[in-house]
Amino acid sequence: MNEYSSTKTFEGYSTAFRQWKAKHSHCQYLHGYAMKFKVTFIGDLDELNWVCDFGSFKRNGIKEHMSHMFDHTTIVAKDDPKLSTFKQLSEEKLIQLRVLDGVGCEKFATYVYNYINNIILKETKARVKVLTVECFEGGTNNSAIYKPIQALNNVDKSISH
């Protein structure tokens, strides 16, 4: 078995959120970024010599779900003390609210990893998996990479051979 990797970028999502626990920082206030995600897939090639058929993302709902979660949305942590206020804004059609375990590049990268990896593993019968997800806040701001420990161990083994 040979392992190849390929990368798909999802970008152009206008997303607002706040780090409510960051009382020492302006990040505690609602603010937004043009979010971008770089998803790296790893696995054997298929009969078309592709690691991953990116065209399938329309059919399997990945493209639509990414847009639903991150395009012109306000994402709030489920433990945000102002969650009820955000829910009211959503009910009044002032925001498109999404609630996640946490917010920020690290949490968004983890969410995207879990969502896409579950679909890809099923669709390819585990021939392909997500290796990493890198989430960018805007064009020049920071990014965070999510890579599960198991994936790190597999990469380390493949490098040492």
Description of each model-found segment:
Residues 1-161:
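Charge-rich, low-complexity N-terminal segments
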